[in-house]
Amino acid sequence: MMKKFGRKALALSLTAVLGASMVLTGCGEDKKGEDTTAKIGLTTGLASDTTADISIMTWSGDSKYYEDIGSMDLSTDKLTSQNVAQVYSVAKQFKKLYPNIKINLWAKTGDPDQPGTPKWEQEMTSFKAKYGKYPDIWASTSVTNDIKKGLAADLSVFKDDETYKAYNKNLMSNLNYYGFQGGLPSFSIPWGIWVNKALAESKNINVPDPDWTIDEYTRFFTKSDNTSFWGDKSTPVNIINMGTTTINKQIKEKGTVDLDNDEVKSLLSYIPKWAASTIDVAEGAGTLSKDIKIESKTYSWYYFCNNRCLTNITDPWYLTAGADESAKESESYIDSKDWDIYPFPSTDYCGNTIKVVMDPICIHNYAADDGNKEWSDDEKAKLKATYTFATYWTASTEAKQAIFDQKWTDNGAEKSAAGDSFPVVTGDTYNKQMDIWNNLPAHKTYKDKEGWKEILKLWENNESWDYIDKCWTSKITEKGETTDVLYEWNNMWKEEVAGAWMTDKDWGDKVKARLSDWNTTINKRIETATKQLQDKLVENYNFDKSKFTSDNK
């Protein structure tokens, strides 16, 4: 059920962190008084002679520091990190538009919280100690925590900017807190369910259509022989999270959950059926062969790639690697002649839908630098320059094309720096950027996949009610202890939490008996976390308390 953050980091794109002290000249027009934005495809009116020094910090990199990377001439063999290659390509293009703006880059190797290295929060602090200030834009692992620290600027001041208005509203809403826009969407992809159609057909298992129901999904899932292949690596509880109106949907819309209701109780009966057809249960029972474990290194995605699972619900970030025919020897390549990605199945309560993966970026709250919460003209100018780069980077077609055209070296193979990430904008700009996405060789296989076509429809119509854990108060810290807000629900597979194992006959009854208490405990945590965020919005930003009643997020 739980995803591996490390595997996700390997597929990250557009998740850099900008940090710098800036010296700015100009605030909307060039020296001749002519607005140059129409010429360069930007909409903020930032003068072309603006001077700034911007440092980028990102994870999943190479732990090298690149000063003024946009002025460098790096050969493909020197670019061994996809994220570094992406930032390099965008900085080069931005340099043509703003020759006096320097972009520097430090890219941490591995994950933000890579084992054996400082946590991402500590890296942020170290950045400040080394460079004299916090990053200006960073890939955030918790936007609400960054707001509580007073680090993130409110970007709603740009709400009239045309680029701001072009962002996908569903993505932007996850970063909006009572009107406070805490960041911008960066790496974003739809999250569906991988389906190994060829494996199913080889076992004489009928493959449902992409508009499948939860019962069709269950019949398909449980046709596994549980010896050589299974339904999935782990129990797909996310089917219930997305198949009710009172869990993920209610978190997104109201910021609360309701676990103790008929919707949830009726769907709990599916869990023991699913669990019995998972690799996790086979491993726990000692029936999973050693050879199969070694073959896939016990990793959920590799089990799917090696035809050991009919489905995979936990690893959405292999859109490129899974389909890259130029890297068939890669462990991440799907070794199946026919596969697809389906939406989540419908239930009696919700239609087919998708989850969403989004990595947000935040922009530094310059007003806090001098201890005065009010914005000076100089601080506003810094914010405008940083926001201009951030929007060019994440939203412009020019940046997407530059990334597509840029090459990097992946284990000796030369590849495009483009990857999984979807456009984070809408309208004609979205269509143009999806054309670029579709032109990547590894992505061309998707055009003929029926499930994928449904995924695209749901994405484009914003038919997802998923919340983003990096944007919501998914964890709470009290007295130095950090707890998962949804701890009991997310750990109901543990005997010590539920009172039984998922495959036990009485598991469902024991969980149902606990739902009321879990509901109370979880919502108390949510209430506390929400109050902490509200208090810090007022303390750090002089935020208007009256706005707390107009939005339940």
Per-range role (PLM):
Residues 136-139, 310-315, 321-322:
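Paired acidic/hydrophobic, glycine-rich loop segments that form the ligand-binding mouth/hinge
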Residues 116-134, 200, 218-223, 294-312, ...:
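Short helices/loops that flank or line small-molecule/ion binding pockets
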Residues 38-42, 109, 113-118, 138-191, ...:
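Hinge/lid segment of periplasmic solute-binding proteins
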